[in-house]
């Protein structure tokens, strides 16, 4: 059975919802899934004042454990067109894994959230994939296999590189049913492709 980690950073809970949906999809695809998050770097008093969702019950990951999985889906908030510093800080601690080649031929995939439709989602998806490629990971994107991302009648999440959601910091827009469905699709797709590669 494929062992998968869904690893995320979420300040306001939007990516937490997407990560849980991706984990559901991966389980539907036959994977044994672990859901974890990266540590918060913002001081607690600042996080509270900024209305961060600080009651997330999902356990915190350690960089060394990434080698324990066949596949890793990373979900991160986007800051100025890049992954959030919390996720970057976590991934920057994986140099020891890189030196050992511990993630070579593992499967990787990425999802992101932004506060606006033009908030740099595709840049964040691709730059996060770069980190995975430096580790020798095999990238499985959302791709246009997920057809529900097509059309512009409403705000739709998704890009060929990975699933996206647009959610306002004030909570007025949460991940939509279509965006959560896309996260489930991506999780299932990664599980099924990983099973073919590692099964």
Swiss-Prot record:
Pfam family, one: FMN_red
Binding positions (substrate): 98
Reactions catalysed, as given in the entry: a quinone + NADH + H(+) = a quinol + NAD(+); a quinone + NADPH + H(+) = a quinol + NADP(+)
Cofactor descriptive note: Binds 1 FMN per monomer.
Xref: InterPro entries: Flavodoxin/NO_synth (IPR008254), Flavoprotein-like_sf (IPR029039), Flavoprotein_WrbA-like (IPR010089), FMN_Rdtase-like_dom (IPR005025), NQO (IPR037513)
Presence of the UniProt keyword Cytoplasm in the record: no
Domain Flavodoxin-like: 4-190
Disulfide bond recorded as keyword: no
MF terms in GO: flavin adenine dinucleotide binding; FMN binding; NAD binding; NADH:ubiquinone reductase (non-electrogenic) activity; NADP binding; NADPH dehydrogenase (quinone) activity
Disordered, as annotated region: 158-181
Binding site for NAD(+): 12
EC number(s) on file: 1.6.5.2
NCBIfam families: flav_wrbA, PRK03767.1
Protein name: NAD(P)H dehydrogenase (quinone)
């Amino acid at each position: 059975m494929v062992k998968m980690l869904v690893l995320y950073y979420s300040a306001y809970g939007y990516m937490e919802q997407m990560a849980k949906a991706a984990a559901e999809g991966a389980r539907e695809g036959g994977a044994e899934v672990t859901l974890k998050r990266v540590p918060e770097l913002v001081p607690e008093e600042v996080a509270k004042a900024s209305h961060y969702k600080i009651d997330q019950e999902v356990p915190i990951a350690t960089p060394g454990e990434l080698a324990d999985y066949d596949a890793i889906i990373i979900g991160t908030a986007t800051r100025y067109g890049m992954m959030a510093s919390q996720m970057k800080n976590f991934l920057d601690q994986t140099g020891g894994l890189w030196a050992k080649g511990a993630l070579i031929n593992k499967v990787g995939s990425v999802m992101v959230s932004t506060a606006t439709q033009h908030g740099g989602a595709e840049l964040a998806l691709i730059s996060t994939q770069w980190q995975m490629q430096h580790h020798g990971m095999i990238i499985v994107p959302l791709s246009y296999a997920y057809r529900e991302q097509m059309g512009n009648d409403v705000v739709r999440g998704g890009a060929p590189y990975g699933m996206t959601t647009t959610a306002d910091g004030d909570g007025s827009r949460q991940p939509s049913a279509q965006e959560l469905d896309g996260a489930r699709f991506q999780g299932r797709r990664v599980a099924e492709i990983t099973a073919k590669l590692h099964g």
